[in-house]
């Protein structure tokens, strides 16, 4: 879509001007300098709870969905300060922290070991972009 079409959808086009700072929600990696992205609103928490939320996400042009192995944390998470939020089965927040991305894997492991935790969301702690959803691997 052209810029007017994007604006009608509350979205804007951006060109990455640094190697970090443009995390693609689809490919789960940072855009390279010069890559085109869309910055769009995304209902990352569509649950019928007080925590229902929409926030900004970047999507790289031509991005392919990432496929991660069980217990893997996207590499772009390790490179930033992250806000982590754990939710229960009623989609209510029960735990939250801000931490360096290299600590996220251990935090998720401890949270998801608790049967009362249903899933977690990761956000960029500085700019608030939604990074990804974390849940238990299907068996």
Residue positions per predicted region:
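N-terminal, charged amphipathic alpha-helical interaction modules
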Residues: 1-72
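Short solvent-exposed loop/turn micro-motifs enriched in small/polar/acidic residues
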Residues: 22, 77, 113-115
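Short, solvent-exposed amphipathic alpha-helical segments in soluble enzyme
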Residues: 54, 75, 136-139
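An N-terminal amphipathic alpha-helical segment
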Residues: 57-95
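Short, hydrophobic/π-rich interface segment
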Residues: 83-119, 123, 136-138
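Short Gly/Ser/Thr- and Asp/Glu-enriched loop/turn motifs at secondary-structure junctions
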Residues: 124-129
């Amino acid at each position: 879509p052209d810029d007017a079409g994007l604006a009608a959808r509350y979205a804007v086009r951006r060109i990455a001007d640094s190697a970090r700072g443009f995390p693609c929600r689809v490919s789960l990696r940072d855009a390279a300098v010069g890559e085109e992205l869309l910055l769009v609103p995304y209902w990352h928490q569509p649950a019928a709870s007080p925590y229902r939320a929409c926030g900004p996400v970047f999507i790289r042009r031509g991005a392919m969905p990432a496929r991660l192995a069980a217990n893997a944390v996207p590499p772009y998470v390790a490179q930033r300060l992250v806000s982590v939020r754990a939710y229960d089965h009623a989609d209510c927040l029960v735990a939250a922290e801000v931490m360096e991305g290299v600590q996220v894997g251990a935090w998720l492991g401890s949270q998801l070991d608790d049967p009362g935790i249903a899933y977690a969301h990761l956000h960029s702690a500085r700019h608030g972009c939604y990074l990804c959803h974390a849940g238990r691997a299907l068996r």
